[in-house]
Amino acid sequence: MELIDLKAEPRKGRGKSAARHLRNNDAVPAVLYGAKMDSMPISVSTLDLTTMVRVHGSSGLFINLAINGDTVPSRTVMLKEIQMDTFDLKYLHVDFQAINVSEKITISVPVEAVGESVGVKAGGMIQLIRRELDIICKPGDMPEVIQIDTTDLEVGDSVHVEEIDLGADVEIPHDVNFTVLTVVPPTSDVEEEEGDEDLEEDVEETAAEEEEGVEE
């Protein structure tokens, strides 16, 4: 399990004005919480956060968080959530969750389709229904990505949660029948089928109208 070093400062002010002041001074308001601790308002450097996300992404990160003035040198945490202003692309707030590496946690892991399926070779397309899945495991057992082999999938085939095996130490807490990905037919085929259905409906409606006219 890789731990990424990140520094933080205690945060005294609360409310929108205090948060705005932090953002205007190259810092992002954040909070650290955990099962056996009171939540701690903190802040992190905007530059440090940006660099971390650019290098490591924002999913499934475990961090060695050193808070200035804390009672311990550092805490093992995971990045739980980042809130962003999607218009200005600025960080608004960050949630960190303290963890115990010997205890199981729930975390989201990205899903990746691998291999060129029979269906894709025939013109179909892989459609990811769920780009991330929640898993329950110890931090050290967490896979960086859930890879699904699509080699033998034909058009119309799907992969469900019950078909994904991540080992005995990793649990997927989703419904076993949940569809994760599917191989869909080419768009042109779908449009042709829809067109044929519309044509059949038009013919049936015309025939019905003609029958009504004859009866009158």
Swiss-Prot record:
Query: What is a single molecular function from GO for this protein?
Result: structural constituent of ribosome
- Whom does it interact with, and what assembly results? Part of the 50S ribosomal subunit; part of the 5S rRNA/L5/L18/L25 subcomplex. Contacts the 5S rRNA. Binds to the 5S rRNA independently of L5 and L18.
Q: State the similarity comment.
A: Belongs to the bacterial ribosomal protein bL25 family. CTC subfamily.
GO CC aspect terms? cytosolic large ribosomal subunit
Q: Where is the sequence biased in composition, kind Acidic residues?
A: 189-216
| Species per Swiss-Prot/TrEMBL record | Desulforapulum autotrophicum (strain ATCC 43914 / DSM 3382 / VKM B-1955 / HRM2)
Superkingdom of the source species:
Bacteria
UniProt region (Disordered), positions on chain: 184-216
Tell me, what does this protein do in biology?
A: This is one of the proteins that binds to the 5S RNA in the ribosome where it forms part of the central protuberance.
Example GO biological process: translation
**Which UniProt keywords are listed?**
Ribonucleoprotein, Ribosomal protein, RNA-binding, rRNA-binding
**CDD domains from the entry?**
Ribosomal_L25_TL5_CTC
* Name of the molecule in the record: Large ribosomal subunit protein bL25
Pfam families in alphabetical order: Ribosomal_L25p, Ribosomal_TL5_C
Name the InterPro entries on file.
Rbsml_bL25/Gln-tRNA_synth_N (IPR020056), Ribosomal_bL25/Gln-tRNA_synth (IPR011035), Ribosomal_bL25_b-dom (IPR020057), Ribosomal_bL25_C (IPR037121), Ribosomal_bL25_long (IPR001021), Ribosomal_L25_dom (IPR029751), Ribosomal_uL5_bac-type (IPR020930)
